[in-house]
Amino acid sequence: ALYITEECTYCGACEPECPTNAISAGSEIYVIDAAGCTECVGFADAPACAAVCPAECIVQG
């Protein structure tokens, strides 16, 4: 699964991109539910959230 680092700017770009709704707003940064994250396998060639993240803070867990 992927996770979001502390460099997250809380912009919200990632949340609507997740096909499994595994991303939600945490208290200070967005968070990825590891149980729900498929890294977009079966949905896209690469993780959609990481592709749109302007801070490049969505990384491999």
From Swiss-Prot:
Provide any one GO MF term from the record: 4 iron, 4 sulfur cluster binding
UniProt remark on cofactor binding: Binds 2 [4Fe-4S] clusters.
Record's Pfam families?
Answer: Fer4
Where is [4Fe-4S] cluster 2 annotated to bind? Answer: 18, 37, 40, 49
Tell me the SUPFAM superfamilies matching this sequence: 4Fe-4S ferredoxins
Q: Which UniProt keywords apply?
A: 4Fe-4S, Electron transport, Iron, Iron-sulfur, Metal-binding, Repeat, Transport
Q: What cofactor requirement does the entry state?
A: [4Fe-4S] cluster
Q: Which InterPro entries match?
A: 4Fe4S_Fe-S-bd, 4Fe4S_Fe_S_CS
Q: Which residues bind [4Fe-4S] cluster 1?
A: 8, 11, 14, 53
The UniProt function text for this chain reads: Ferredoxins are iron-sulfur proteins that transfer electrons in a wide variety of metabolic reactions.
This protein's name: Ferredoxin
- Please give the organism: Chlorobaculum thiosulfatiphilum
